A protein has these predicted regions:
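A short glycine-centered flexible hinge/capping loop motif at secondary-structure junctions
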Residues: 38-40, 352-356, 375, 379, ...
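N-terminal membrane-entry
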Residues: 306-323, 410-415, 731-748
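Hydrophobic alpha-helical transmembrane segments that constitute the membrane-spanning cores
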Residues: 46, 370-391, 478, 751
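Structured, solvent-exposed hinge/loop segments at the ends of secondary-structure elements
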Residues: 42-193, 198-205, 246-250, 263-293, ...
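Short, strongly hydrophobic transmembrane alpha-helices
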Residues: 24-52, 56-58, 328-330, 372-376, ...
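Alpha-helical transmembrane segments of integral membrane proteins
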Residues: 1-28, 299-306, 335-362, 366, ...
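Interfacial "coupling" helices/loops that link adjacent transmembrane helices in transporter permeases
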Residues: 328-372, 755-777
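"Rare, low-scoring activations can occur
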Residues: 207-218, 233-308, 526-540, 618, ...
Length: 777
């Protein structure tokens, strides 16, 4: 067929389909809405997946960015490690891995690697106390190298980015704001350039605002500001000894390959330089048998970050909404098939007038594709609403911005167009196939009623199959939702080992406003005393971090009865009266006393990372039941000593002595069994206070803030919430999945019921004469 004729007949088909759909406006509206809901649900989930998993970083030529990762059979002799890069890291157990490296190794790569046009590094995020811009507030900062922005090719929206000269210990303190932070906290004022603010008490000049599109190298993570790595000792003293320490890994390294340089060549060069770095110092950082190696991996899409949290639930939701689309196609296909049966005489007339089967197939598929197009357009609007609703749910589970987006880009538009086309073909095949098999003589000879009656019997087999498919898919969706809801209920019913009711949590960190460790301890004790005097307060204590917050850590000990064997344990520094406040049970020994905190302070190094004082007493600790069962074989641990797992070259520690045994308490997760846990006195650090009340804890929030303000006016209160809310955030992923699955299951049920109702209505309509005769008889 000539192109002109094909275009002409296609236009005719579209016009006829449009007139037909307008004549059957009610049925068309229901069909389009059904399809729009299904397509909208799929597009909403896909748009979020697109922003998190599929998009390249908003940097210049992201395909040339590479990130370094290390792996080994045994953990190297790194005596200090931090997983600040948001990468997937495993420091303990067999086959450890990570993406953090030492500052000296970064400098060596930056200055001597010929395969890269530029090499940058970063660490963070750090909580920074921002003063000098109204009321003091907490911001999330990232430590970056001076060439960070130039390596990524990220320009400044205002002012200038950081430069290599800024990353120098003797350089003035400077910072670059993120675009969102500039708008929110500085009202988008251009006068911010050159403004001096305090960061943890360090006067810092704002020199620029980052591009609007850039937030970090980790999709889903948002940082408020960026400061040079060289400022880290001034902002946080604990970073100081790490600057020139080859055994301290804390920086993530990214490099931009030179044009024309292959990854294999760059890998070989990095291997050589990494091998040289391992031999630096008095003792090698690994043995040949440890197989410590470095690997270059593409950083085109960024680091793992939020992907670890959201990939699985998004994949589950994508499968669920895919089932919704199948139900909708079966639903509409059944209705379209029923309409095709009632149009048998029309199809017969078309054939009699010379219309070929191909022409009829085109006409019927055009009608279906027109419906699918309308459904896809409406689905885009529904997807925007759905994506906003999901993002709002996710945002409510976090104390800081998630950075997730559901923006529509070309990939999302192509996805919507694709599933609309596939849907139109899926639900259009059955009626098109039926229309092509019209019996010309019988359809023209009989009246429409008889034709429909016979067509009904031919329709039953395929129509029933579509109905069964809808019901089956609906049942699968309902069962899946039921299992997810049941999982959430089971997790919520888990006993955490302490009373989670009526506990108010908030965090303070006096080091952010210049307090030294001794002064920090005094302020923490003063706050504990003043908070305990508030009305309706029945207990107050503190810990380095809240239980079940998902952010607690651990360490490795060496026990006298297991020499040379590392014994892993959770580790939580706490204050006096901690177990009484939580209503946990002390099973043996005693609780911490003020003298224990004095002993712990005496064994603390006077210089961060340095050796402990000579002849320091052992630090008193309390262990849980799981620790006793696993490492003491049920024997009494009271009075027993143990120490950190010793790595040659590290300073000796004075060790620990067990003074008590406490009942098992869930630590980081409600899913996992209680692991060995060690509690020590909290010394010289920011802490999370736990305030138990006899009434609603939220009613005490204002009084707590006022007490903190009166005690130290410059001390910000961070992340105030109840213990129940903290656990709720821990279960956020399970809760969101259960809620969305429940909604999708109800939607599947509604679509299936609507489809069955339509099919039954058509069935009854075609049997009106038969029913009338039966009633007359």
């Amino acid at each position: 067929m000539p192109i002109g004729a094909f275009v002409g007949t296609t236009v005719q088909d579209i016009r006829f389909a449009s007139r037909l759909l307008r004549r059957q406006f009610g049925a068309t509206l229901i069909t389009v809405l059904t399809l729009a809901i299904a397509i909208g649900a799929n597009t909403a989930i896909f748009s979020i997946m697109d922003g998190l998993l599929l998009r390249d970083l908003p940097v210049e030529d992201p395909s040339h960015l590479m990130m370094l990762k290390w792996s080994a059979h045994k953990r190297p002799n790194y005596h200090s490690s931090s997983s600040y890069g948001d990468c997937v890291a495993q420091f303990g157990g067999s086959n450890p891995s990570g993406c953090n490296f030492s500052h000296p190794f970064y400098e060596d790569l930056r200055d001597h690697a010929s395969s890269f046009s530029s090499v940058a590094a970063f660490a963070g995020g750090e909580q920074l106390n921002v003063s000098g811009n109204g009321q003091a507030s907490i911001a999330r900062g990232q430590l970056v190298s001076g060439n960070y922005f130039s390596t990524l090719g990220v320009a400044a929206a205002l002012g200038r980015p950081l430069q290599p000269d800024d990353d120098n210990p003797s350089a003035p303190a400077v910072a670059v704001l993120s675009y969102a932070y500039w708008l929110h906290d500085f009202s988008g004022s251009p006068a911010v350039i050159g403004k001096t603010v305090g960061l943890n008490g360090v006067p810092t000049v704002i020199v620029g605002v980052a591009a609007r599109s850039y937030t970090s190298l980790t999709p889903g993570n948002i940082y408020d500001l960026f400061v040079p790595i060289s400022m880290s000792p001034r902002l946080t003293p604990r970073w100081d000894p790490r600057q020139d320490d080859a055994g301290s890994i804390w920086l993530v390294i990214v490099g931009r390959l030179k044009p024309g340089v292959l990854t294999d060549r760059a890998q070989a060069e990095v291997d050589t330089m990494f091998g040289r770095a391992l031999s630096v110092g008095a003792k090698p950082l690994s043995k040949p048998g440890d197989a410590l190696a470095v690997t270059l991996t593409p950083a085109q899409s960024g680091l793992a970050g939020a992907r670890r949290q959201f990939t699985q639930p998004l994949t589950i939701m994508m499968l669920a909404v895919g089932v919704i689309l199948l139900i909708a196609c079966a639903n509409i296909g059944g209705l379209q098939l029923a309409r095709a049966i009632s149009r048998e005489k029309e199809m017969a007339l078309r054939i009699a007038l010379g219309g070929g089967q191909g022409r009829i197939l085109r006409q019927l598929l055009t009608e279906s594709l027109l419906v699918a197009t309308l459904g896809g357009i409406a689905g885009l609007a529904f997807s925007w609403i759905g994506a906003r609703a999901i993002l709002t749910m996710v945002a409510g589970t976090s104390t800081r911005p998630t950075g997730l987006t559901g923006d529509v880009d070309v990939r999302v538009l192509l996805f919507t167009a694709g599933i609309s086309l596939v849907s139109g073909i899926l639900f259009g095949l059955a009626p098109a196939s039926r229309g092509m098999r019209t019996d010309l003589n019988r359809s023209l000879r009989d009246g429409s009623g008889n034709a429909a009656s016979r067509g009904r019997w031919r329709f039953i087999s395929l129509g029933q199959s579509l109905a069964v498919a809808q019901i089956a898919l609906c049942v699968v969706t309902l069962m899946g939702a039921g299992l997810l809801v049941r999982t959430l209920q089971n997790l919520r019913s888990v006993d955490p080992g302490f009373d989670t009711n009526n506990v108010l949590l908030f965090r303070v960190n006096p080091t952010l406003i210049g307090y030294k460790p001794v002064a920090v301890d005094a302020l923490n004790r003063q706050l504990q005393s003043r908070l305990g005097a508030l009305p309706n307060v029945t207990g107050v204590s503190f810990a380095s971090t809240a239980l079940l917050s998902g952010s607690l850590g651990g360490t490795t000990f060496e026990l006298p009865n297991r020499p040379g064997v590392g014994c892993d344990s959770n580790w939580l520094p706490v204050g006096t009266g901690y177990f009484d406040t939580l209503r946990a049970h002390l099973l043996a020994g005693r609780d911490f006393t003020p003298a224990d905190f004095v002993a712990a302070a005496a064994s603390t190094p006077t210089v961060p990372g340095g050796p402990p004082p000579a002849n320091a007493p052992p630090t008193p600790v309390i262990v849980n039941q799981a620790f006793v069962k696993q490492y003491f074989a049920g024997l009494s641990p009271l009075g027993r000593n143990f120490n950190y797992k010793h790595t040659p070259g590290e300073p000796d520690h004075s060790g620990f002595v067990v003074i008590g045994v406490v009942s098992d308490i869930k630590y980081n997760s409600l899913r996992e069994a209680v692991a060995p846990t060690t509690y020590s006195p909290a010394i010289g650090r920011g802490v999370t206070f736990a305030v138990r009340t006899a009434a609603s804890p939220t009613a005490l929030a204002a009084a707590v803030r006022e007490t903190v303000r009166q005690t130290e006016p410059n001390l910000p209160v961070i992340d105030m919430s109840t213990q129940a809310e903290t656990i709720d955030r821990l279960l956020a992923q399970e809760r969101i999945i259960a809620q969305l699955a429940g909604f999708i299951a109800l939607l599947a049920l509604l679509l299936a019921c609507t489809g069955l109702f339509g099919l039954l209505s058509h069935e009854v309509g075609t049997r009106t004469r038969e029913i009338g005769i039966r009633m007359a008889l």
